[in-house]
Curated annotation (Swiss-Prot):
Protein name, per record: UPF0014 membrane protein STAR2
Protein localization: Membrane
GO MF terms, alphabetically ordered: UDP-glucose transmembrane transporter activity
Tissue specificity field: Expressed in roots.
Function: Associates with STAR2 to form a functional transmembrane ABC transporter required for detoxification of aluminum (Al) in roots. Can specifically transport UDP-glucose.
InterPro entries attached to this UniProt entry: UPF0014_fam
Induction, as annotated: By Al in roots. Positively regulated by ART1.
Topology class, membrane: Multi-pass membrane protein
Organism: Oryza sativa subsp. japonica
Length: 285
């Protein structure tokens, strides 16, 4: 299965080497190809019109979001094209660290009342995704090249970002709402970790449930992005499911490691050196 999947990826992604921005006619073909994405903005116009008629006040935000997405994807396309043609592993590391940094900042913003939340989220995401990626490379599921590692890492980082942010946010909320229970446990001699075990478990269950539910229903409700991309790229459905199974496995692994680690890193900030709840953390709105 691993050999056939690697061959499939190689066959589908070999077109990358055939794209050269310096080649004659490249920019004309690129601009012609962008006509379809531009035409697709018609559905955004429909959404903006509906927002206006319903007085939602989201017109400006919708237009800004789509313009930003258009610009970001256009830029990242050229950046990835450059990286994919490089042989140095340094480019892989640089791109990966950039994704982790942005993801850590975003997850930390969700849990902004957790002290050092951005750093905790970044470290958790880095650990969860790097361990998972190392296992995949060691098992020869993916070769260590930019065109394989960067897209796969992007999927893992994005998923781990969401799960980690939810875990940290829910943990702080639950500890704050059940402060009396936690303080009683501390008074009876429990350690901070023991006193918050129930809240930790609840936050992890809430954060990981969407990942688990997605794995349960994959292919039944909607075709996942990786599988859809492969099929649209010319692969057979049987070939596409091989990669999608790997994707679901790696998302589950990376998300679980990242979310669990984030609880170990953020809960000490909830307590003082005297093993009392830190009022400053839970007094924030």
């Amino acid at each position: 299965m691993m050999a056939s999947m690697a061959a499939l990826l190689q066959r589908l992604l070999v077109v990358v080497n055939q794209v050269d921005p310096g080649a004659p006619g490249f920019w004309r073909e690129f601009l012609v190809g962008m006509l379809k994405p531009v035409a697709a903005t018609a559905v955004v116009a429909m959404a903006v019109a509906l927002s206006f008629t319903q007085r939602l006040g989201l017109e400006g935000e919708m237009l800004y979001a789509m313009a930003r997405a258009f610009l970001q994807l256009s830029v990242i396309g050229f950046v990835l094209q450059f990286i994919f043609t490089q042989k140095s592993a340094a480019w892989i590391l640089l791109a990966y660290l950039f994704m982790v940094t942005v993801a850590g900042y975003t997850a930390g913003q969700r849990a902004r009342h957790v002290p050092r939340g951005k750093h905790i989220a970044a470290v958790s995401i880095l650990a969860g995704t790097s361990v998972t990626m190392a296992l995949l490379v060691a098992l020869r599921v993916f070769p260590f090249t930019p065109r394989y590692i960067i897209p796969v890492a992007g999927m893992m980082v994005g998923n781990a970002m969401t799960v980690t942010g939810v875990t940290m946010k829910k943990l702080r909320e639950d500890v704050g709402m059940q402060r009396g229970v936690v303080e009683t446990a501390l008074a009876l001699g429990a350690t901070p970790r023991q006193a918050t075990a129930r809240q930790v478990r609840r936050s992890l269950v809430i954060a990981l449930s969407p990942v688990i539910d997605n794995a349960k229903t994959v292919g039944l409700i909607a075709l996942p992005g990786a599988m859809t991309g492969l099929i649209m790229g010319g692969a057979s459905p049987l070939e596409a499911i091989q990669l999608q199974i790997v994707v679901m496995n790696m998302l589950m692994g990376a998300s679980t490691v990242s979310s669990i680690l984030s609880t170990y890193l953020c809960w000490p900030a909830f307590f003082t050196g005297a093993f009392q709840l830190n009022d400053a953390v839970f007094a924030a709105d």
